[in-house]
Amino acid sequence: NFQPIYRSVCRLAGKGDKRIGMIGGLPRLSSTKERIAAYQEAVADCGLPQDDLLIRYGNSMENSAQSCLDELLEQKCDALVVAQGLMASETVIYLHKKGLKLGEDIDLVTFVDYDSDINYLYSNQMDCIIQPVEKLGETAGELILQRIETPDAPAFEQVLTSTYQPCGM
């Protein structure tokens, strides 16, 4: 979660983007906290303005990104990082309806599933952070079964890696 967001924000800054907005998921989730921390660290390291108005939170459900997008576009963002797949789809549709062209009028980085339609259709116009969703589901199922079989076993953490894919790659 951390490294792909950090790299993507630094890449946007390197392209000349100055006001990079961030839409995170639910603030209480560890993945959201980690992604926001990566965004904030990258913004600071790249010498960009640190402005809380550039960070918004959706609820990771359908129709939760639109109000965030309205607010971020009012802040004159020239790039957006959307840290959740469903909100990413909504963002692409919203920007299209507003007449904004990805990669020209606004830069976009989104979390997507490897086989998502958004990744397939727009990977040449936006940066993608590809999540191994099948492996996430498989691993979660295995951990649940292990917990049922051995409820007193010590807890452990398994980290699966997302892949950062700059546009056109």
Show which residues each predicted segment covers:
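Short beta-strand elements in bilobed, periplasmic/extracellular small-molecule ligand-binding domains
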Residues: Q40-N63
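Hydrophobic alpha-helical segments within soluble ligand-binding/sensing domains
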Residues: N1-M22, A37, E62-L69, A88, ...
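An alpha-beta-alpha
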Residues: R7-G47, D152, F156-M169
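Short acidic capping loops at alpha-helix termini that bridge into adjacent secondary structure
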Residues: R19, Q50-L54, L102-L108
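Flexible loop/turn connectors
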Residues: E71-M169
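Generic recognition of short, well-ordered alpha-helical segments
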Residues: K33-E34, S67, I93
